[in-house]
């Protein structure tokens, strides 16, 4: 038996990268899959039906069930059509994985409004549209799963990706709130921060040494790794898992901390600006988060 036997899932951005592998792995685990992909370029331009259809053909050739959809997650009514396709074709919908995305990388001082808005629309608005179009169905059937896609660009930060990072940090917060709101109706949501070699990561500028290291890591950083985690989280075996942020990169799986106060300093009557500069900031400095990549977490071999 497959881990997703009897499940119907929707995968946006399912024609390439992480979405492609998620759709294929889910089908191997018994799910019926709606493979959505507009087929746009990395910057969101254009459209191409072949990526989504190719994944459907792969699934069907292996004996699975799938149907393609070519709409955009930026349009709520279009996402509604994706949901209706699942209901009409397969008789239900149980989980959604939403890695559909684009990039418009630029330093903040050079970024245009259009570059900012394009990222917010596809990533953050796209995640909202998916939830808004499916949450009523999930609540009614008292069951549903969201796998949302955050990024270390938001959770940790990455130069040149202020738009993308802000959207991805927003997705982490959105996932947490959907998990809180959905708990009473058995609706789960988790966010994933993947490290995988895809056409999106290939577009990120890097020096020659980093590029060589990246190429050597391509197999280890396969998009199959986060796809396997997404499928596991959509299964009934993970019914108790919600509101979490997971990282996956290469052979490693991580669980992220979520923002909570580290220390609180109280002053009778409250703090004025002079007191903050004199007494609060010097005391708080030991707990500041440094810029740059954080120290590696402890690795536990299993």
Q: Regions from the language model: what does each represent?
A:
Residues 2-35:
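Canonical Rossmann dinucleotide-binding motif of NAD(H)/NADP(H)-dependent dehydrogenases/reductases
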Residues 5, 62-65, 85-98, 104, ...:
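A glycine-rich helix->loop->beta "capping" turn
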Residues 22, 28-29, 138-140, 156, ...:
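Active-site-adjacent segment of SDR/Rossmann-fold oxidoreductases
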Residues 59, 107-108, 112-117:
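Substrate-binding pocket helix/loop in short-chain dehydrogenase/reductase
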Residues 131, 167, 175:
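Active-site helix of classical SDR
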Residues 151:
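Residue(s) in the substrate-gating loop at a strand-loop-helix junction
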Residues 212-302:
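C-terminal helical subdomain
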């Amino acid at each position: 038996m497959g881990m997703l036997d009897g499940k119907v899932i929707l995968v946006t951005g399912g024609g390439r990268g992480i979405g492609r592998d998620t759709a294929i792995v889910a089908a191997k685990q018994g799910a019926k899959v709606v493979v959505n992909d507009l087929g746009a370029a990395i910057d969101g331009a254009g459209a191409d039906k072949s990526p989504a259809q190719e994944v459907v053909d792969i699934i069907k050739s292996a004996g699975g069930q799938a149907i393609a959809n070519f709409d955009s997650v930026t349009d709520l009514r279009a996402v509604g059509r994706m949901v209706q396709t699942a209901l009409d074709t397969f008789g239900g919908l149980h989980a959604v994985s939403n890695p559909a995305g684009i990039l418009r990388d630029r330093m903040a001082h050079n970024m245009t409004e259009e570059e900012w808005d394009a990222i917010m629309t596809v990533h953050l608005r796209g995640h909202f549209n998916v939830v808004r179009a499916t949450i009523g169905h999930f609540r009614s059937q008292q069951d549903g799963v969201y796998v949302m896609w955050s990024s270390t660009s938001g959770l940790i930060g990455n130069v040149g990706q202020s738009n993308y990072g802000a959207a991805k940090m927003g997705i982490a917060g959105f996932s947490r709130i959907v998990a809180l709101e959905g708990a009473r109706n058995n609706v789960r949501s988790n966010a994933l921060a993947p490290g995988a070699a895809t056409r999106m990561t290939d577009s990120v500028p890097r020096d020659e040494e980093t590029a060589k290291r990246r190429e050597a890591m391509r197999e280890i950083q396969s998009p199959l790794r986060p796809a396997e985690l997404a499928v596991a989280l959509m299964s009934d075996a993970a019914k108790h898992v919600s509101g979490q942020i997971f990282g996956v990169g290469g052979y490693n799986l991580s669980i992220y901390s979520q923002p909570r106060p580290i220390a609180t300093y109280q002053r009778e009557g409250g703090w004025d600006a002079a007191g903050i500069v004199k007494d609060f900031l010097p005391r708080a400095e030991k707990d500041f988060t440094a810029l740059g990549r954080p120290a590696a977490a402890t690795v536990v071999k299993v």
